[in-house]
Design a protein with these regions (language model features):
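A short glycine-rich, Lys/Arg-flanked "PGG" loop and its adjoining helix->strand segment in the class I
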Residues: 135-147, 345-357
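A short helix->loop->beta-strand "cap" motif at the edges of active sites that frequently abuts
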Residues: 74-75, 149, 281-282, 355-358
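A short SAM/SAH-binding and catalytic strip from SAM-dependent methyltransferases
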Residues: 119-132, 328-341
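Class I SAM-dependent transferase core
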Residues: 1-46, 196-253
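Conserved beta-strand signature within the Rossmann-like core of class I S-adenosyl-L-methionine
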Residues: 148-156, 357-365
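General small-molecule cofactor/ligand-binding pocket signal
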Residues: 21, 103-105, 176, 311-314, ...
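Class I S-adenosyl-L-methionine
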Residues: 2-4, 157-220, 230-233, 366-402
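Conserved SAM/SAH cofactor-binding pocket of Class I
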Residues: 34-123, 242-320
């Protein structure tokens, strides 16, 4: 099942029972949430049956889009999410439930959507996305809708009035249906004006502007960088203790510039930008589940003078083993809320795949680092600990492949 797997949940829709595999750290991992079920019920009427091309924006493990696909056998459904783990689980759930004509892929908002002319766009709007992002998720659907196409969204109750005001205050929006409960609100709406199907989805750079929060600068070991940070990512104004420890470990090493460096979970881009400013690696590979982190880090590297041809991004749950085999240096910020088994498996893979003489710098809570070192010792991998530092419950360790 894999280290992220938590359980299987069920969803009854269109006379079928779907069995959906759920990851521990995806939204609504206990059961299909009430808001999703409410939105599906509002779309169950015969008037919606002819909506053939469907986009599920922010799909998670797929209950909305796959539920709509199960309800109408001639539908084609696109499932998109900025989280590669969500995309992976949506794809697996479509296959496990024998639902064809389903595409699952990564997209930052509408920027990477592979089609236009959708008859229906659905979304369970994330409550913590930030006002500019929520506005884009609600109004940006005009870029991909067919003429007469419908948008159907569900929001939690605290967002109800804000969303209603935004939709009712937009002259091209016609709200055609509303339903509210104590905890959720559903809105169905259309866009007037010129046909939207001729529109082209915004490019990733334009989409990224919606997430921009502020400018911030950091100096470590005499190396200074300045970033444009984003909503939805940590460390928007300063470095956390773990990032400081990893940055200091890299700057302290004083070794020759790496030909290829890989940064796992780059966040806002502090580590790759500090590494670029200090060592000028020949290639910088950025790997993350979160497409926002990849795009923000890439933009910040370019703003700090890194040539675009040197930056490569991988929207993946874990690094591609082939991308590790020529890496001289790997910086891995281990995700704090990831299942312990997943974190350990990632570290074992990193150390097993890098070439002899390459180094891995791990950053995490001290307990996590100790557990990973014990797993490496038990696996008897040829690796030595070069350095380890601790501060405020955080830890960074430098490992070298022998």
């Amino acid at each position: 099942m894999g280290p992220h797997f938590k359980k299987t949940v069920t969803l009854d829709v269109g006379g079928r029972r779907l069995e959906l595999r759920v990851a521990q750290d995806l939204f609504s991992s206990h059961e299909v949430d009430v808001g999703t079920r409410l939105l599906l019920r509002t779309l169950a009427g015969p008037e919606h049956g002819a909506r053939r091309l469907v986009l599920d924006l922010g799909c998670g493990y797929g209950p909305l889009g796959l539920g709509l696909r199960a309800a109408a056998p001639d539908r084609v459904v696109h499932l998109v999410d900025r989280d590669a783990l969500a995309v992976e689980y949506s794809r697996e759930n479509a296959a496990a439930n024998r639902l064809e004509d389903v595409e699952a892929y990564g997209s930052l908002g509408y920027a990477d959507v592979r089609a236009v002319g959708f008859d229906l766009v659905v979304s369970n709007i994330p409550a913590k996305a930030g006002a500019p992002v929520i506005e884009q998720l609600l109004l940006g659907a005009a870029e991909v809708l067919a003429p007469g196409g419908l948008v159907a969204v569900v929001v939690i109750a605290p967002l109800r009035e804000r969303v209603a005001a935004l939709l009712e205050g937009s002259p091209q929006v016609e709200v055609v249906f509303r339903r509210a409960t104590a905890s959720y609100a559903v809105f169905h709406y259309r866009f007037g004006g010129p046909p939207a199907a001729a529109a082209v989805p915004a490019d990733p750079g334009t989409a990224l502007e919606r997430y921009q929060r502020q400018e911030a600068s950091v100096t470590r070991g005499g190396v200074a960088v300045r970033l444009r940070t984003a909503y939805g990512l940590p460390e928007f104004d300063s470095l956390g203790f773990t990032t400081r420890l990893v940055a200091d470990a890299v700057l302290r090493s004083g070794s020759r510039p790496p030909g290829t460096a890989l940064v796992l979970h780059p966040g806002q881009g502090w580590l790759p930008c500090l590494l670029w400013a200090a060592a000028r690696p020949g290639r910088l590979r950025l790997v993350d589940r979160d497409l926002l982190a990849l795009r923000v880090s890439q933009a910040n590297l370019l703003a700090n003078g890194c040539p675009p041809e040197r930056v490569h991004i991988g929207h993946r749950v874990d690094p591609d083993p082939a991308g590790l085999r020529d890496a001289d240096l790997v910086l891995a910020m281990l995700r704090p809320r990831e299942p312990a088994g997943s974190t350990t498996a990632t570290v074992l893979s990193l150390v097993a795949e890098i070439p002899r003489g390459a180094r891995v710098v791990l950053g995490a809570g001290s307990t996590t680092i100790t557990r990973c070192l014990a797993a490496l010792d038990a696996a008897k991998l040829p690796v030595r600990t070069v350095d380890r530092r601790r501060a405020k419950g955080s830890s960074a360790v430098v490992l070298e492949r022998r």
